[in-house]
A protein has these predicted regions:
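Glycine-rich phosphate-binding loops of nucleotide-dependent enzymes
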Residues: 2-244
Length: 244
């Protein structure tokens, strides 16, 4: 049995005129926070979008729980237990918080010969997952009544609702207040303790050194290396990111 829950091996992804990923790699252990770092354009988000099925790799392999898998799209990734909280939020503000948490995978029930959304179960489950991530929000309330930072925390609740084994957080604190950052770190610590593998993308060195167990650095689409976070300093990270 591999010590890794998920491996991305030799991933190549080319867009017109640019090789965004050039044999990139990442190895995630259970119950760890793995920071993914690099300058803008290093390929971090592209690699994660390949993991989550938004992009399809030109070359490379994804090994998940010991098996090579083909992730066909985001819903396939979610069904496998891989969730992603994007830097660019895609909320549906006119829908309820509960509907946003379960969009695309609503619980259903039979009403005679017809299959319909089971709203009672959806809202009960949404209330449970909101409580699990310490959010005191009414799942029936419209998402649009929340601030941008509160919507970001709902996205994390959405990921947790999928009972994820791998959680990708792409710049998760970009719109959060200091108190909300602390709330996020509490959630991350609890998920790590439950064995979830967390990928944490951030440019904030203090966050990386505080929350991470391992750090992988990318540069110009290439894998540079992986370090134990305890071995790193801000200067060493910057040196590896810029290559000089």
């Amino acid at each position: 049995m591999s010590e890794y829950r998920l491996e991305m091996r030799d991933v190549v992804k080319t867009f017109p005129g640019v090789k965004a990923l050039n044999h990139a790699q990442l190895k995630l252990k259970p119950g760890t926070v793995h920071a993914l770092m690099g300058e803008n354009g290093a390929g971090k988000s592209t690699l994660m979008k390949c993991m989550f099925g938004i992009y399809h790799m030109d070359e490379g392999k994804v090994i998940y729980e010991g098996q090579e898998v083909q992730i066909k799209g985001p819903l396939d990734a979610l069904n496998r237990g891989i969730a992603m909280v994007h830097q660019e939020l895609q909320p549906i503000p006119e829908r309820s918080i509960g509907e946003n948490i379960y969009v695309g995978r609503y619980p259903t029930k039979k009403y005679g010969p017809v299959t319909v959304i089971d709203h009672d179960k959806m809202y009960a489950d949404a209330a449970k997952v909101l409580k699990e991530v310490h959010l005191n929000y009414d799942p029936h309330a419209k998402l649009g009544t929340l601030s941008v930072s509160q919507m970001q925390l709902v996205e994390i609740a959405k990921a947790v609702s999928a009972d994820c084994k791998v959680l990708i957080l792409d710049e998760p604190t970009s719109s959060l207040t200091a108190a909300e950052v602390e709330a996020l770190f509490t959630i991350v610590d609890e998920l790590r303790a439950k064995g979830v593998s967390i990928v944490y993308i951030s440019h904030k060195m203090d966050e990386i050194l505080r929350i991470s167990d391992e750090v992988t650095i990318m540069r110009d689409g290439h894998y540079i290396g992986t370090w134990d976070a305890k071995e790193l300093t801000t200067d060493k990270i910057i040196t590896q990111m810029v290559g000089r």
